[in-house]
Amino acid sequence: MNWHTLYSLVFAAVSLKSNGIIAPSSTHSGVENAVIIQMFQWDWDSIGEECTDLIGPAGYGFVQVNPPAEHIQGLDWWTDYQPVSYNIASKHGNRTQFKWMVDKCHATGVKVITDTLFNHMSAVQGPSTGTAGSAFTKHDYPGLYSYDDFHHNCGTPNNIIIDFNNRYQLQNCELLGLADLDTRSDYVQARLVEYANDLRSLGADGFRIDAAKHIPANELEAILLQVPGFRSTSLYITQEVFGGTQPGEEVRATEYLGNGDVHVFEYANEIKAAFISGGIASLKDLDSRGWIPSASANVFVVNHDGERLDKSLTAHSPSNTYTLGLVFSLAYPYGRVSVLSSYDSGIEDHDVGPPDGGRAKCIGTGQDTDANRGWLCQHRWTAVAGMTRFRNAVRSTQLENWQSPQRDRIAFSRGNAGFVVINNSDSPWNATLITGLPKGRVEVGADGNVTIEIHGRSAIGIHVRET
């Protein structure tokens, strides 16, 4: 039985001979859906429209949006990450537009996570003005912060981090020359709490804490304890902690688990290594590499930094490996998965900002990057839309029936709720496989087996529960 027959008989199936796209079903349940879409550099109007058009109906749980605070001027993407005030007035939209976006997403059952900067302000030395006209210099933000609210004289030239394995430097020196806030200060903490609570008042459901590793975990906790919903299901926290899982690293990822989820960058590195050269059969025990517990892990095949650091699979990776990596990530039971939705030019030009100033629109099924004016629209790809429904359906079921007859061919089930096959080799794969699915579903025999043919560099995902 080939995959075309399978597709006609199940709720969701994915064929990935290339980056083929299908429109997702509009059905999803009231149970919280788990997948986060990082809408990188999309403006607020575009995200609100996309929540209505596709993100909500497709069953995504969250959108992660860029930092909404006023920042330094400029078109490059990284200007968003140099705040100059806590006015909701970034290049992606103003306060009214932000609130409109949140309301539109909420109306379709989608929660909103804001990328949030507690560690630092800008690196701009001389007098300047931000995106909303606020005057500032590197260590003076009138009405907000002054010189004594920052770390100084940390013991390195120019006060910049040199040794990224030294706890004191990591948490007291400047990251890339960015003015480093003294987050131990009661005054600084109060300003950060005001900002977080303002975002909450506008409907924000969670925060991605940028550069969390550069803030002592107890100081970050002191801030978050003053935010309504902290340590409840009403507020999702994920923290950017590079590394911290290997022997000898002074700042440990586990220090931050009490505050929320933690990024697992090692996960992305392992996915790339397996799909490019190491063999995907090695991924069976990906959840037991000594990183952090699945319940606290926020994982991704690539995020916006990974696109620019050459340590992750991207849309430019060869032989459909990026798409297949996404299929695996959404099928495998480790962590909460984030999926990047970005733009094509940023993969090669690491500074360039978004097309059309962030005004994004995915045409039809999102397949044609040219028609989308340079936006990749990954959240509309079959691998993401179809496998998001798969993940929503299988939820907490266990990985079972792992089969890997060759290093680049794997199949496994998620309990009796879902089954996935990935062929990362160039040649077709004809096999009789154990599905774990109930007999009589998708032509599964009485022994629970199914015979399939799957093209090279392709995958199939099946679930038997409506979402």
Model segments located where?
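Active-site mouth loops of central-metabolism enzymes
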Residues: V35-S46, L178-A190
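Alpha-helix-centered segments that form part of catalytic cores
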Residues: S15, F164-D186, T388-T397
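Active-site-proximal helices and loops of the catalytic beta/alpha 8
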Residues: L9-L16, I21-I36, F40, E49-G56, ...
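Solvent-exposed, flexible loop/coil residues
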Residues: S90, S185, R441
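Classical eukaryotic N-terminal signal peptides for Sec-dependent ER targeting/secretion
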Residues: M1-L9
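Glycine-rich FAD cofactor-binding loop and adjacent beta-loop-alpha segment at the N-terminus
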Residues: P83-A89
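Core domains of carbohydrate- and sulfate-ester-processing enzymes
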Residues: T129-L176
